[in-house]
């Protein structure tokens, strides 16, 4: 059976092409508390929230070399929240004037039978993990501090094991394409977190 | 110079000629007397400079005189002198030694002069007394004591002076420090109440309600300044505060939102700026610093501006049948026909006093404080809503937004459901609704009150409930007759006053909806009052043992009433001889007729048919009672008297 054609055209979400601006960093477990404390002071005045999410990464291999990747994510601690399907494009490092990593991004809320639908379409699950951490917000900026847990038995999210002794810190903004001004705000915010965590644009290609 | 006696030197020889030798023959050979110059040279050679003499001046004068004498040979002598120095030829010239000595003396004098001048400055060199031992023992011990005492006293004085100087310095420093410290402590107090941040060398504060959820674009920044224009030496005034705040000029003064309801809408052309009537500035609370009141006032101005901006934005956006008008600082809306709600922003700055406001005094009764207060409540609710509507997405990677909004896709919401998520009532709509309710309530109260005061016979009582909603309140209306409250409880009405209409709930559960027009309520109450009289007769008949023959709330006969319908009742006496018929209309009033037994009517024409005496028990014709001539203070009492008069004596 022939594999369904995979479009390599840039994926856009509706009429507006949304981009995700991203800065990443990490903190060791023991300094998590001071970082949380600092974030509570800097971010919008609201109760800090925790989250437990289960993410599954699906691949669709076509004739092309690079597979098509979709990320399905669901909340484990909030009942009734919709699933979240996300497409992330190739990250662009950009020049020095842009202070954040930029990638194409399409967000869709879906019902819970998403996995079946993706399987039917020919997607195949590549890997899955559980993310557990804290969520902050300042204006349009979203700050997530979380730890990634490996799932020992596939499909069983209760049986997990921490992947590392550190927390991943992500500062992200989803904005329409071309609004590079937001990266300045992000840089300023990252500066204020400086001694605790260094948020940088990390090129995933270099890590591979 | 030492005190050795000087040797007198005479420059003239005692004798004229010196004897060179005395010959054996006794002849004296004289030496040729020395010429003047030779003599001088000889004498000069004999001067011993190392040995001082008492007559220095004299000698110096002589030497000078000599020098003058020798002035003629001066120039050549100088040259000779130089040569002499160079050639090391001593005694080339008779004054050589004198000159050399004078020279060295001059050098020493110069050095001494320099040293003294340096010493006098006391900068680089000081003169220290050589240790006492060096003094010759023959020194007077008393002088020594005196000197040492003087010295130690001087030392002590110096120490004291130094101490005093240090003290004055520290006192001035303290004063300065105190001011500084006061500023810092004030700043600390300010910090406890207001948001501050440092920008460059300035301290800026935040007046805005942004952290509370406000979206008003005014930055609301104030600057903290150090109050330094006070002289330290002068007395510090009571209200002096080392810290001062500078608020933006557009937030100065005092402001408030004024809401009023007028009966008649003025011509739009007449609309102008609403004048302020002056309000005294709020007195600062004792103990609270001066900047606190200043900042609170500025924050109030900011909030009022935000309320007004929000209202005017909504006034323009909302499509209503009668459009809302925004003119200058006034928003005009028409909640009911011929009724005008005006909301205005009054802002007065302290320095600018308008003389107009003093003359044109607004009447305070059309000033709705409740609505003004509610506007403040509403804007705060609005703030809270914007704060709480920001919800964290779950799962965490999802974009920000309302949860129901994201559910709309997967759950396939239709248009109405999506609209219901988004729609929220604006501030203006809410306040107009409240104003409508307030107006309706006051109109209801006025109607009931005027009826109660105008109509005495059935009494009308209103019991207002104390606890109301902003959009609904209720009143219980009782219609009674004086003295018969216990038996006449037929009419009890519950009036629920809403925003647009009044719902009337009868005692038996019937519900009537009245519109906002006051006339409707009045007509309704009038008809209820007229029904009450008939009900009262019915109740009274029960008590008196009379029989109700017929009863009708709405009679279809007789003259047509303009309000409601007339009601009627007919009751018969216990033995059936008499009957009373009452017809009561809201407009026509009451008409009471009594039916007599046939045998009591004298003027009744004899009928051919009714010959038998048994027909005498048939009732005869009705006769109207002249009701206004009856005894009794009210309708029910009169009726009771009538009934008892027609009842047979049971004894």
Swiss-Prot record, chain A:
Gene3D superfamilies linked to this entry: Hypothetical Protein Pfu-838710-001
Keyword Heme: no
Residue(s) carrying Phosphoserine: 66
GO biological process, one term: positive regulation of transcription initiation by RNA polymerase II
Keywords: Activator, Nucleus, Phosphoprotein, Transcription, Transcription regulation
Tree of life domain: Eukaryota
Keyword Transmembrane listed: no
Protein name stated in the entry: Mediator of RNA polymerase II transcription subunit 18
Gene label: MED18
Subunit structure, interactors included: Component of the Mediator complex, which is composed of MED1, MED4, MED6, MED7, MED8, MED9, MED10, MED11, MED12, MED13, MED13L, MED14, MED15, MED16, MED17, MED18, MED19, MED20, MED21, MED22, MED23, MED24, MED25, MED26, MED27, MED29, MED30, MED31, CCNC, CDK8 and CDC2L6/CDK11. The MED12, MED13, CCNC and CDK8 subunits form a distinct module termed the CDK8 module. Mediator containing the CDK8 module is less active than Mediator lacking this module in supporting transcriptional activation.
Function: Component of the Mediator complex, a coactivator involved in the regulated transcription of nearly all RNA polymerase II-dependent genes. Mediator functions as a bridge to convey information from gene-specific regulatory proteins to the basal RNA polymerase II transcription machinery. Mediator is recruited to promoters by direct interactions with regulatory proteins and serves as a scaffold for the assembly of a functional preinitiation complex with RNA polymerase II and the general transcription factors.
Provenance organism: Bos taurus
UniProtKB/Swiss-Prot annotation, chain B:
A Pfam match: Med17
Listed Low complexity bias regions: 62-74
Keywords: Activator, Nucleus, Transcription, Transcription regulation
Cross-referenced InterPro entries: Mediator_Med17 (IPR019313)
One cellular component (GO) term of this entry: mediator complex
Cellular compartments annotated: Nucleus
A molecular-function term among this protein's GO annotations: transcription coactivator activity
Family assignment from sequence similarity: Belongs to the Mediator complex subunit 17 family.
Quaternary structure (record): Component of the Mediator complex, which is composed of MED1, MED4, MED6, MED7, MED8, MED9, MED10, MED11, MED12, MED13, MED13L, MED14, MED15, MED16, MED17, MED18, MED19, MED20, MED21, MED22, MED23, MED24, MED25, MED26, MED27, MED29, MED30, MED31, CCNC, CDK8 and CDC2L6/CDK11. The MED12, MED13, CCNC and CDK8 subunits form a distinct module termed the CDK8 module. Mediator containing the CDK8 module is less active than Mediator lacking this module in supporting transcriptional activation.
Family annotation (PANTHER family): MEDIATOR OF RNA POLYMERASE II TRANSCRIPTION SUBUNIT 17
UniProt protein name: Mediator of RNA polymerase II transcription subunit 17
Natural source organism: Bos taurus
Lineage: Eukaryota, Metazoa, Chordata, Craniata, Vertebrata
């Amino acid at each position: 059976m022939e594999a369904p054609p995979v479009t390599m055209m840039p994926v856009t979400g509706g009429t507006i092409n949304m981009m995700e601006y991203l800065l990443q960093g990490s903190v060791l477990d023991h300094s998590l508390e001071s970082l949380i404390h600092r974030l509570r002071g800097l971010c919008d005045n609201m109760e800090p929230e925790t989250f437990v999410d289960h993410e599954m990464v699906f691949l669709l291999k076509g004739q092309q070399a690079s597979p098509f990747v979709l990320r399905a994510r669901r909340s484990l601690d909030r009942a009734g929240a919709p699933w979240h399907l996300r497409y992330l494009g190739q990250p662009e490092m950009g020049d020095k004037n842009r202070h954040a990593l930029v990638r194409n991004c399409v967000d869709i809320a879906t019902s819970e039978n998403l996995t079946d639908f993706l399987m039917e379409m020919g997607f195949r699950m590549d890997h899955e993990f559980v993310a557990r951490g804290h969520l902050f917000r300042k204006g349009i900026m979203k700050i997530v501090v979380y730890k990634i847990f490996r799932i020992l038995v596939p499909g069983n999210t209760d049986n997990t094991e921490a992947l590392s002794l550190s927390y991943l810190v992500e500062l992200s903004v989803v904005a329409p394409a071309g609004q590079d001004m937001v990266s300045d705000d992000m840089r300023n915010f990252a500066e204020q977190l400086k001694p605790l965590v260094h948020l940088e644009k990390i090129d995933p290609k270099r890590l591979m | 110079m030492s005190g050795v006696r000087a040797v007198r030197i005479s420059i003239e020889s005692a004798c004229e000629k010196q004897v060179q030798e005395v010959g054996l023959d006794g002849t004296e050979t004289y030496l040729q007397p020395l010429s003047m110059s030779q003599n001088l040279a000889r004498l000069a050679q004999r001067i011993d400079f190392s040995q001082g003499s008492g007559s220095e001046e004299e000698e110096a004068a002589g030497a000078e005189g000599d020098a003058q004498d020798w002035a003629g040979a001066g120039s050549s002598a100088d040259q000779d002198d130089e040569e002499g120095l160079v050639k090391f030829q001593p005694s080339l010239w008779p004054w050589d030694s004198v000159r050399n000595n004078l020279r060295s003396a001059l050098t020493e004098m110069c050095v001494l002069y320099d040293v003294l001048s340096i010493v006098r400055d006391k900068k680089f060199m000081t003169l220290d007394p050589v240790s006492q031992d060096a003094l010759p023992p023959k020194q007077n011990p008393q002088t020594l004591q005196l000197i040492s005492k003087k010295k130690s006293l001087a030392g002590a004085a110096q120490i004291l002076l130094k101490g005093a100087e240090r003290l004055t310095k520290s006192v001035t420093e303290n004063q300065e420090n105190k001011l500084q410290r006061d500023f810092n402590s004030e700043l600390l107090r300010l910090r406890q109440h207001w948001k501050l941040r440092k920008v460059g060398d300035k301290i800026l504060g935040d007046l805005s309600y942004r952290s509370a959820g406000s979206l008003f674009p005014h930055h609301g920044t104030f600057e903290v300044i150090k109050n330094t224009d006070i002289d330290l030496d002068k007395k510090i005034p009571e209200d002096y505060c080392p810290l001062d705040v500078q608020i933006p000029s557009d937030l100065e003064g005092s402001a408030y939102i004024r809401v009023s309801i007028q009966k008649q809408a003025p011509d739009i052309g007449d609309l102008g700026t609403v004048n302020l009537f002056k309000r005294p500035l709020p007195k600062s609370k004792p103990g609270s610093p001066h900047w606190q009141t200043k900042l609170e006032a500025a924050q109030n101005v900011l909030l009022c501006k935000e309320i007004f901006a929000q209202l005017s934005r909504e006034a323009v956006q909302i499509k209503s049948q009668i459009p809302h008008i925004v003119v200058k600082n006034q928003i005009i809306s028409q909640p009911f026909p011929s009724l005008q709600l005006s909301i205005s922003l009054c802002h007065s700055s302290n320095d600018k006093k308008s003389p107009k406001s003093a003359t044109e005094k607004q009447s305070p009764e059309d000033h709705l404080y409740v609505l003004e207060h509610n506007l403040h409540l509403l804007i705060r609710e609005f703030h809270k809503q914007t704060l709480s509507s920001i919800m964290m997405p779950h799962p965490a990677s999802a974009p920000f937004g309302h949860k129901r909004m994201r559910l709309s896709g997967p759950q396939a919401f239709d248009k109405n459901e999506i609209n219901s998520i988004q729609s929220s009532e604006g501030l203006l709509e809410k306040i107009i609704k409240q104003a409508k309710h307030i107006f309706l309530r006051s109109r209801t109260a006025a109607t009931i009150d005027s009826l109660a005061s105008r109509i005495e016979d059935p009494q009308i009582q209103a019991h207002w409930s104390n606890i109301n909603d902003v959009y609904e309140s209720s009143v219980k209306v009782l219609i009674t007759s004086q003295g018969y409250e216990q038996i006449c409880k037929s009419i009890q009405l519950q009036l629920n006053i809403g925003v647009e209409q009044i719902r009337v709930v009868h005692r038996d559960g019937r519900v009537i909806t009245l519109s906002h027009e006051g006339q409707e309520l009045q007509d309704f109450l009038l008809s209820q009052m007229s029904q009450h009289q008939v009900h009262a007769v019915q109740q009274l008949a029960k008590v008196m043992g009379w029989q109700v023959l017929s009863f009708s709330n709405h009679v279809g006969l007789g003259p047509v009433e303009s309000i409601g319908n007339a009601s009627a009742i007919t009751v018969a006496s216990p033995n059936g001889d008499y009957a009373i018929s009452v017809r009561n209309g809201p407009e026509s009033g009451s008409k009471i007729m009594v039916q007599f037994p046939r045998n009591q009517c004298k003027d009744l024409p004899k009928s051919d048919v009714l010959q038998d005496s048994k027909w005498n028990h048939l009732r005869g014709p009705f006769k109207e009672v002249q009701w206004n001539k009856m005894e009794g203070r009210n309708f029910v009492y009169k009726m009771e008297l009538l009934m008892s008069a027609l009842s047979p004596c049971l004894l």
